[in-house]
């Protein structure tokens, strides 16, 4: 499939310099390739475009294994592959759901490309659920994270399973890790697009909190943002829950995101935030890596990042591509901005408005209890909502169709009407659940 046609499908006008360089190097050279480029520069597409060209679409064999450090990146990368419209079959494998369910799905899909976490991939290969003999391309995305303590042994076991590898592609947003010998990348081409200077498109501010508990200051700060898309970063799961509860009680549309949530809860939180149903995502540093959500205007460091690397990945969520962004440090007495934060830092004083109300997002998220396995498509959902709930097409936003359920963004002001009109109705002859996702 031509690159221009894929870009049209993705709504991208042209590749950036890093993506063009990666595409040409991976396709035209036999060497292994290491791509170093900041967060938010499109590394997923940088390797998927050439991979799609190198895979034999006429063969049912598994030919490409993409290793990622977490389930969110596995799911998002597989979604990009699907949206490219290359016709290649792909699947994401990750922990948090039964291996047997994935095994059944693998037999149905017969993927040519698999995205997965190291432990789950090892499990499938060890049980013979996937064949290693025809795998010719190994991709390790965020290889610095994959090779950290706890992943290293699993990675070494995994890499040793592929006897016929022709190419290794490693990608990272940092240059902190040496590539271990077991990866066996002997003749490698390194594309280094890391920039030492801080991103000039991110403006950095400090916000003084008079109280040690910063929640009141956070409220005033978020009120000043109106309905701008914002991620608030904290260092601990219980702090995320407490902060999200406070903001919800104060009328903000909030999603909470951390590793203590189950997979479906995490998916719902991300869908609400990415489709515009929640203006604020309150997250641990789990949300600083691998999430590809465009148009995030503000990053708020409620807690100071524990490491420079965490800081780099946090601010990488904003100012993506050619857009601008803002980062805010909320500081109580005795707290200081770390020395590694470079660039001009301005004071920001949000207006005190105790009676002000948060802006409400235009959209809300609707949950549908059926999905791909029930032959439900985006077109079916749009047609059903326009006919049964009397919505206009402009009232319907992003639709995400999963195997067994769907998320649909609809006009928030019409959500009650939708729930009333769809109650007891069948879609494609199937009775199902329709309900609003509120967190």
Where are these regions (language model features)?
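Conserved pre-motif I regulatory segment
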Residues: 1-36
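Conserved nucleic-acid-binding Ia/Ib motif block in the N-terminal RecA-like helicase ATPase lobe
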Residues: 2-5, 59-126, 134-137, 242-257, ...
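Walker A/P-loop NTP-binding motif
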Residues: 20-29, 44-59, 80-84
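Post-DEXD/H (motif II) to motif III coupling segment of the RecA-like Helicase ATP-binding lobe
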Residues: 130-196, 341-342
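A short beta-strand element within the Helicase C-terminal
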Residues: 134, 289-304, 326-330
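Conserved interdomain hinge at the start of the Helicase C-terminal
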Residues: 201-246
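Conserved segment of the helicase C-terminal RecA-like domain
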Residues: 280, 307-311, 315-348
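Non-catalytic terminal extensions of ATP-dependent helicases
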Residues: 351-439
